[in-house]
Amino acid sequence: MAQLPLDLQFISAADRDDFIIGACNRLATTWIDRWPDWPGQYRILNLVGPPASGKSHLGAIWGVRTGAVTLRSSGDANAPDEGRHFVLDDVSVDDGWDEEALFHLVNRTANDGGSLLLLSREPVSQMPWKLADLTSRLRAVTVARLEPPDDAILRQLLEKYFADRQLAISLPVLDYMVSRMERSFQAVQTIAAAMDRRSLAERRNLTLPLARDIMAEFADGAHARQQALPTQTEQTGSQEEDS
């Protein structure tokens, strides 16, 4: 297993106060806040949800709090030499996780009084592991699901994205976007970045006409052309490097 940083591209800070809570993620957040009071002999929590659902953000918050090491499968059968608490990112049978290494990490963490936070798209207890002992261990894992966001969460996430980049956007524009966008965290990231790029490229404010253009492009798939354009954050970073 190799150590990899969590994906913090859409996060301004791995701070508990920076995480937006709603019905979709309240249970998962409650379990993160309850640590180290996690049930079971092995003290393992499994956060389950689709990509960009907030699993990595919660993992980062927990990692900062516990000093956890973040791991992702790379074909290495040896568990890390240091650490008592671990975040295992994007756990999946299909992604080549070494079952023997995972089994030994579960046992070692329990013996050391540590904890495991498993991030996955489906419950690890329902995955078709071949190793019977590992399957037995994972059946006892506590599961907390992150559900699709509601309108209130989508609006707050959009506000946060633009506020973090010091970009002004009005409530009517936000309401327009929320009423027409897909109910997913991934959609927030993609649409907000597209607005950011178009605003920079065309030197336009984040207005209702711009939002209409972006949402129309997402409806017909033309937004893919915008991916080659830099966001204001990316351009600022480039200018700083050149100076």
PLM regions and their residue ranges:
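A short, basic N-terminal segment
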Residues: 1-34, 38-39, 200, 204-243
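Walker A/P-loop nucleotide-binding motif
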Residues: 40-58
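Post-Walker A helix-loop "phosphate-sensing" segment adjacent to the P-loop in P-loop NTPases
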Residues: 63-74, 82-83
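Conserved nucleotide-sensing/catalytic segment adjacent to the nucleotide-binding pocket
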Residues: 80-120
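Short regulatory helix/loop adjacent to the ATP-binding pocket of P-loop NTPases
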Residues: 124-139
